[in-house]
Structure formats: C-alpha cells, structure tokens
Design a protein with these regions (language model features):
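Buried hydrophobic packing segments
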Residues: 87, 118, 122, 144-145, ...
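N-terminal leader/targeting and accessory segments in enzymes
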Residues: 1-89, 373, 378, 382-391, ...
Length: 457
C-alpha cells in the first residue's frame, strides 16, 4: 500500500486538521494491533471488542497513524465518523489509483475454488493477487485490496454474503471488470426469505460493474429476474453458452471437455462440480489473453485452499475424502454424487460421515431430510450421522439400510457425543475402505480427520 497520511485523510474526509502531522509514507493497513509494524495505518474496527481500546498498543508497535472515531491524544490520527466506512473508501480509492483489473467471484458453492483456479490461470501471464483465506466480507475485501503487492495487474476477489445487500456493497467498492456467480444454493438460508432472495443477493455482484462488463451466471431459472440488461451475460450449464461436453471422473482427478475448448483439460482434483469451476475459470482466462496451452499446463500444478474437497490417508491405510470446510444441501448432494461415482477400492467398502449443515433457518430439518435421496445402500455400506438437525435423516436412513449400518451421535447444548463418534468411525473403518466426511465447519469434522490421520490424537 503506497499512500501517505495526508492522502488518506483527504480520501476519507478527515474531520480534524492532519496538516500538523508529518505526511509520512504508509506501508500497510492493519485492524489487529498485534500485527502492526513500523509505518502502518491502524484501523480500529468495532466488533466483539472495540479496536479503539488498542490504539495505544498499535503505536507501541510502530503505527504511523490511526483512523479514529474520537480524538486521540499524543499521536497522529485521522478523525472519521465511521472507521469501517473510511476503510472501505480507502480501498475503493486505491483500486482506482492502481487501475488494477478486478475479477469478482461469488456463489453458494465453488466460489473459493473458482477464485483459486482463476488466479492460478491469470498468474501464468500477469502479476496476480487473490483473496487470502476467507477474507471475503465488508472487512476482508478492503483488507485484501490494501494488501495487494505493488504492481499487481489482476486482482481476484471472493465475495460472500450473510444478508441481502452485502454483495452490493462489495461490488460498488471493487468495481469488477468481470464477475462470476458460480451457483445459487441454500447457504445462509437462515438470513434470507428463500432461495430467490439468495439469488437476488448473489446477482448484486453486477451492481458495481460498468456497462458491457462480463458477467458469468449459471443456467438456472432462479437468476433470470436478476440478470442485468446492460452487461455482457454468459450462461453456463447444460445447453447454455458454456457447457461440459465430456467428463471422466477418477478417485483423485478428472478430465473434461467444454464446447469452447479445442482439447480436453486434466485436473488433479475430484468432483464434477470442479470441472464446472475449471470451465468458468478457463473461459475468463481466455478472454484475458491466456492461451489454452497455458491453461492446460497450469491446471497440472493446481493448488486449492485447504479443506476444500481433498483426499487424505488414515493411519490404517484407508482413503479419506475430506470436505469439512462448509456445508449446505447443494454441496452435500454434489459431494455424495462424486463419492458414489468413484469406484470402491478392491476389498473395501464406502462409509459416509455426515454432520449438521448450519444456517438453514426454519427449513433446516426438512432440507437435511431431503439428503435421503442421495443415500443408497447399494453404494454406501455405512452412514454415520452427527449433529442435531440431522437426527431425523438418521432415522430415515436406518429404515433404508441394513441393521447395524447406520449410526447417530448427538451434538447439542446439553450433550456432545463427539468422542463416541470418533470411536465408532475408527471401529468401522477398514484398511481398504474409503470414507467421506462432510459437514459445516462448526461441527469440527476437521478434528475427526486429524484423528484418523494421526492415531495418537
């Protein structure tokens, strides 16, 4: 971040006279006082704790100046009405100043993987930066912008939403050149009236785009009412502008063809939904001048954010398909389809561990129960359920599967049977087996994966 104190003050409309402070060059912007280094701008946000309480600590660690909603004694400060708004204004200004091309990605599923893929492809030709981790909200996005390396040419930003209007704010800030909506599912349904309102929120990614900018959206009727008339809209899916024409799935890789590619692409990841993500990323990369051969080569060394669908090994030799970062009905259905399509190991069985999907609101139990349509005793030997809202699904499965092949462990305020879950999984898992783990991050299945990978845990 190459900005000066006086420049920042002008951008955010400082309410105090900053001319009395040296116009120092600022190195970075941080909202965690512990991460402040010499020459940084401190951004004291209000959350569970008020960042203003740590202004003194920030200066002890080397801060050059702080934003603040109140006067600060003995230190350079920029007085504003709202620190978060000022933080966002600063990021928007920095994007305009650097003239970097912005690519925005959202979706109920696939946004992080698509972001990773697109950034990876663009990096073959351009200096590229992307959202780190899950910094995809009203705080994380401006943080990403202000932390992009000097000389960045392409910036790939992930945009998340918890409430209607969240993505509108992010799009107006980022002003994307190209935007992608990967899929409209039921994620965060607790905060929306229905799936249509989720679609409305996702499609607001186009709100900050100029006319004739490129928007990629799924061939899903749910988005029809929200397609912008003044943008170049490209749809993807069966029978759409972009579609997969051939797909071969393997245990830890896949190969696919698309109607706009001359040759097939190989991916070192599993899941047909990842073929769709790769297709989208490839199309955008081609529009930016990346060659098909560069795309093909780049996918061979693709690395995705940890805990997005990945194969691991249990200490006993069994194969673990870990997908424990997050969960919603669409994502659970897709991973069950993928797991079912992969051939079983010789002499081994298939086991699924399914945990609660969070933030589904009043429809939670009903949406959990619908997963019964994705469970088949012809494919899965054993299904182990963990949670509270998933309890009825466990009962439905017990009526479909043979006795002794369905287990349920409770996780509620009054009782958590996690240790019993771990014990049962280890007893059920054979050396040649494959096991799928899927659930919301808060269900802590990542800890179960670690326990299977490390016998002493």
């Amino acid at each position: 971040m190459k900005l000066t104190i006086h420049e920042v003050a002008q951008v955010v409309g400082a309410k105090n006279d900053v001319s009395i402070f040296d116009d120092a060059q600022l190195e970075n912007a941080e909202f965690d006082s512990r991460l402040i280094a010499a020459g940084d701008l401190f951004v004291p946000l209000k959350g569970a704790r008020d960042g203003h309480d740590f202004i003194e600590t920030a200066f002890e660690n080397g801060a050059a100046v702080t934003l603040s909603e109140k006067e600060v004694a003995n230190h350079p400060y920029i007085l504003v009405d709202d620190v978060l708004t000022a933080f966002q204004q600063l990021a928007a200004y920095y994007l305009e100043k650097t003239t970097v091309d912005v690519f925005a990605v959202t979706g109920s599923n696939g946004k992080t993987t698509t972001k990773d893929m697109l950034a990876h492809l663009l990096s073959t030709t351009y200096k590229t930066y992307k959202t780190q981790g899950n910094y995809n909200n009203e705080i994380g996005l401006p943080y990403t912008v202000l932390h992009m390396p000097e000389g960045t040419e392409k910036l790939v930003l992930e945009m998340g939403q918890d409430h209607l209007g969240d993505i509108h704010v992010l799009s107006e800030l980022a002003r994307p050149k190209t935007a992608i909506v990967t899929l409209v599912g039921e994620a965060h349904l607790a905060f929306f009236k229905d799936r249509s309102e989720i679609a409305k929120g996702k499609m607001q990614i186009a709100d900050g785009m100029s006319s004739n900018s490129l928007l990629l959206a799924p061939a899903d009727p749910i988005v029809e009412d929200y397609l912008p008339a003044d943008k170049k809209v490209v749809r993807f899916g069966q029978g759409a502008d972009l579609e997969i024409t051939d797909l071969v799935e393997r245990k830890d890789s896949l190969t696919f063809k698309a109607n706009f590619l001359e040759q097939e692409l190989d991916l070192p990841v599993t899941g047909k939904y990842n073929a769709t993500n790769a297709m989208i990323a490839s199309y955008v990369a081609l529009q930016e001048g990346v060659s098909e051969e560069q795309i093909r080569q780049a996918f061979r060394d693709l690395e995705l954010t940890r805990n997005r669908t990945e194969w691991k090994k249990a200490t006993n030799g069994a194969d673990i398909l870990s997908d424990v970062y997050n969960a919603n009905p669409t994502a659970m259905k897709l991973i069950l389809e993928t797991f079912s399509a992969i051939p079983a190991n010789e002499g081994g069985k298939k086991i699924a561990v399914l945990a609660d999907m969070k933030e589904l609101g009043d429809q939670s139990i009903q949406l959990h129960n619908q997963m019964i349509l994705s469970l088949s005793p012809d494919v899965l030997d054993t299904v182990i359920f963990y949670g509270e809202d998933i309890a009825e699904l466990a009962q439905l499965a017990s009526q479909m599967f043979p006795i002794g092949h369905v287990y349920y462990f409770k996780k509620a305020e009054d009782q958590d049977q996690f240790e019993d879950l771990v014990k049962q999984v280890k007893e059920s898992l054979g050396v040649n087996d494959q096991i799928l783990l899927k659930g919301s991050n808060s269900m802590n299945l990542a800890k179960l994966v670690e326990s299977l990978e490390n016998e002493d845990k």
